[in-house]
């Protein structure tokens, strides 16, 4: 039995009254064990899955394919009960949306033929026990009943239990509930009574605390023990089986159920439990399919999964029943349930027989002896010869131990068996150090467990009887006479009474309150019928039962002052005569139906017509609530419209705030043409859409988003004509290096929802699936993550579909289509996507290789430019010496050296820079644009010179000249590098291709050069760029005939004083290499030379 898969069955129920009133259509079909569901909006799209059992209960009993309660039990219940007798742990749990039929399948009704799996299994259990019981074989049965509500555990069989119980995990026993009552039973009647008592306690607690039973998980556990005596060895062995019958809470959405406030919080806790259960099932399925690298299973994330740890993927034989609604209005919930069940099929449980290890060893040896005997007899050995082996087998050296020498009991150090196997013993030194308080608590808990294990069967029966008496006293105190024998099963034939109504059919009509002759008081203190709750007063109301002369008993309801009491939805302030079938609401949560059997019989005999109203609708909790809302003047439709309007106004307000924030961020970051604005818009849109989706269904979300629009930064978006290779995305609030697959899935969901919303929700399911596959592959490659499981994109597409839904009216008809049409279309689309993705990857690789080549060439060019000026500068340093000055002082000896190195006959005269300083000062004062540009340029030059001085100080005597300036890509030239004629002459200029660096000093008395010739400059640190205006033969071949203006002398300034002042001389030391002018300055400086040349010509 080890390694068996979980049994999965699906069952579809008939239409209920709400679905019938809305003219719902059936979208679920079954053929054999295959179940199919069709999308009501796109009939060609359907889901088909195969399960172990598919039960069609949508029609009536006359249908030959109809699955009754007995058939469901024969297929699932009998098999699980057989495993329990074999010694395995067993679990059956039902899952589905609210109202899908889980409680009916598990519990059923009291009518014959309507009982569910739990009553039938319990009845069949005791039937087999009575048949198989003998002197060598005995049985014992213990039961417990608990409820998990909002992650709190309550004991439903112990009236003294107050509050929630604590869930703990023992290293040997596994997870268990501390102080949970475990009651001994001897017959099916005892179990039925305990289940009724548990349902009553559940109903009372739910009504008093304003809870809904469909929002709580109920776990009914049966501990079945088999004790056998082996006559051969004289040993007693036990096999213990735990049967867990779980009725999960209904899975529902806040928008479909209208949950708000506390109901929404309850739903969040239920969704937490069910979501954790789904995570556990997915993790176990991935573990079986070898898709999961880690063995961690999140059992402890919720109380439900923690308690079901052994039943899910552990030591248990498990079966799941998925309850389905056939209506098209519940398509999304039904589809989710089917996917849930399909994942559960992949789980495999390793179940073992729970028995003593010695007994197991003896059993295995006996089976071996029997097999060898059959083998010897098959070979022709007589039975008389085999009989002589018994003495040898009983000897110490034989196969079986002798009866006179039973095996020694296990030592205290060896722990009891767990799941049929011995756990390794833990030495005290291996255990972690614990504090004294924890040690004392653990000691008390261990002593309590030992006391429960050593408790005799008679003591357990006495404990069960004591708890039964306490429950009877509690029910009598509440005003429910008749005890536990009649409540919820029998109703009085003549006495008027009240029957409770509840949203859950399992908890409805299980509490009965008699109205005695005379006065029956209702309230919280000193009353006959005790109710508790926020809106129940100490003296709430009273019932007067007065016999009439004709024998009829008339019951009158008299409310107390200030107490809220409603009859058929109307507030009662004066005494009112009750009729059989009236709906009574006391406070806000206690709903009852008044039954008067004798009055109803007399009316039928008199032929009194029934009261007006729909005769087919039963008088249940929904009918009472609807009646109460209508009489109170509360129109549900108007309330929903008002709520939608409020949500729309809130969305508009948040959108305006998001628009303002995005506009501020765009202006601050100055990224109108980048993609940062789109990223921020995507995040804000996802925030608003997800918050709106938590409150409303997808179609309503689409309507509001279409009407109000999406958040935008004001940037005009150009339509994308071709697919663009995406840039690297930034995950919000997380380092991309630590991004997980869940983060990538969430990012893909955000981007796809944003694109779908931008396209006015025109995407169909196939397009969303294609986008999901492309986005996931794209994100995985971008962040260097493995693509992981092949169905990761399916989860993304499902989340997108659940968030944005489908456009209203799209996906029209077209009939049923062929069975594999959708699959073929998806495969073709996926192949096309793979092809496009491959092309994009090749283009990306080519672009990256070209970028690498360009970068290598750029680095090589920069290295060459650094080497060439350094060689020329070294030659100049060997020839020149002296101080480097920025302004040419008089009487400098370096002039002669400069003249000797120059091939020109004369040296250029030096002119005082007074005119240049005056012009610069005038422009600085008059032209603000010139002032800003010059200050910006000077700041850059100061930073450059500081860097040169710092590197020169560290490098010693020689220093490499700065490399040629390479402007960044797509960088616009800013002022002062503009072709403005009035600014050109203000910049200190120099000869063609000469850098404005430090020059050797010149004599003032040197003769001027000839006017018709410009001497060539022997010192050029580098060759100008070919595209510059001062480079090439045009500036060097045809020299200018005009003498060089005085304001074109090289000049450097650190400040802008009002009067021109020469720069002080530098400190003596290693001279600096000539300064290399950026290309932009040379292009601007060449313009005056061109003008002079043109004027001369």
Swiss-Prot record:
Q: Which Gene3D superfamilies match?
A: 2.60.200.20, 6.10.250.2520, Kinesin motor domain (3.40.850.10)
Please provide the record's keywords in A-Z order: ATP-binding, Coiled coil, Cytoplasm, Cytoskeleton, Methylation, Microtubule, Motor protein, Nucleotide-binding, Phosphoprotein
- Which of the residues bear the PTM Omega-N-methylarginine? 1036
UniProt lists compositionally biased (Gly residues) regions at 949-958
Where on the chain is Phosphothreonine found, per UniProt? 1077
> Which residue windows does the record flag with biased composition (Basic and acidic residues)?
1086-1097
Subcellular location, record wording: Cytoplasm, Cytoskeleton
Q: Which residues form the Kinesin motor domain?
A: 5-347
What SMART domains would the database entry show?
Answer: KISc
Task: Please name the GO terms of the biological process aspect recorded for this protein, alphabetically.
Answer: anterograde neuronal dense core vesicle transport; microtubule-based process; retrograde neuronal dense core vesicle transport; retrograde vesicle-mediated transport, Golgi to endoplasmic reticulum; vesicle-mediated transport
List where Pro residues composition bias occurs. 404-418, 997-1015, 1059-1077
User: Which residues are in coiled coils?
Assistant: 358-380, 437-478, 630-671, 824-868
> Which positions bear Phosphoserine?
294, 491, 671, 673, 911, 1028, 1086
Residues binding ATP are 96-103
Residue stretches of biased makeup (Basic residues):
1016-1026
Question: What is the protein's known function?
Answer: Probable motor protein.
Put simply, this protein is called: Kinesin-like protein KIF1C
Q: Where does this protein come from, organism-wise?
A: Rattus norvegicus (Rat)
